From Swiss-Prot:
GO cellular component: cytoplasmic exosome (RNase complex); cytosol; exosome (RNase complex); nuclear exosome (RNase complex); nucleolar exosome (RNase complex); nucleolus; nucleus
Name of this chain's protein: Exosome complex component CSL4
CDD domains tied to this protein: S1_CSL4 (cd05791)
Subcellular location per the Swiss-Prot or TrEMBL entry: Nucleus, Nucleolus; Nucleus; Cytoplasm
Family: Belongs to the CSL4 family.
Length: 195
């Protein structure tokens, strides 16, 4: 059976220098090893030597969307003023827990903002690349924008359930029924394409 995982906080005394040597996420003071991070305590030893004591952070749980970060999100609902989304990835890193975001009508396009209609840009279930423009507060969500050519819908499904193909910057087409639907289509950059 694996030993229980021990979590520690910054400044917590882990052991004395005779019991281990300091590794990453630690520092020494007065003959003791202390944690410099919040995370899991790890002890590794090779060939019966004094174990190296280190503290590893759970990176995926610590990752938060920050202003300017490109995020991948899924549209959950739309109305005439904004689209509600769940943020699933920050860059290419998946999040343990989804964050809520809002794309306002005026943040969808860089031009002709007064002519934008939400239902011609997004539909519930669409996967969207967006950029964080504001962190919001305790009551509100992250504010996101798609007002760049590289941002917008990257995956959408037609009413028949088939993944649609982009045919212009504002339309996608179902390959099965050839029905066209309006979307704010992203010009996907090569680094985001998975082959």
């Amino acid at each position: 059976m694996a030993p229980p995982v021990r979590y520690c906080i910054p400044g917590e005394r882990l052991c004395n220098l005779e019991e281990g040597s300091p590794g990453s996420g630690t520092y020494t003071r007065h003959g003791y090893i202390f944690s410099s991070l919040a995370g899991c305590l790890m002890k590794t030893s090779e060939n019966g030597a004094v174990p190296v004591v280190s503290v590893m952070r759970e990176t995926e749980s610590q990752l938060l969307p920050d202003v300017g970060a490109v995020v991948t999100c899924k549209v959950s609902s739309i109305n005439s003023r904004f689209a509600k989304v769940h943020i699933l990835y920050v860059g290419s890193t998946p999040l343990k827990n989804a964050f809520r975001g809002t794309i306002r009508k005026e943040d969808i396009r860089a031009t002709e903002k007064d002519k934008v209609e939400i239902y011609k840009s997004f539909r519930p279930g669409d996967i969207v690349l967006a950029k964080v423009i504001s962190l919001g507060d305790a009551q509100s969500n992250y504010l996101l924008t798609t007002a760049e050519n590289e941002l917008g819908v990257v995956v959408a499904h037609s009413e028949s359930g088939v993944q649609m193909v982009p045919i212009s910057w504002c339309e996608m087409q179902c390959p099965k029924t050839h029905t066209k639907e309006f979307r704010k289509v992203a010009r996907v950059q090569p680094e985001f394409l998975q082959t």
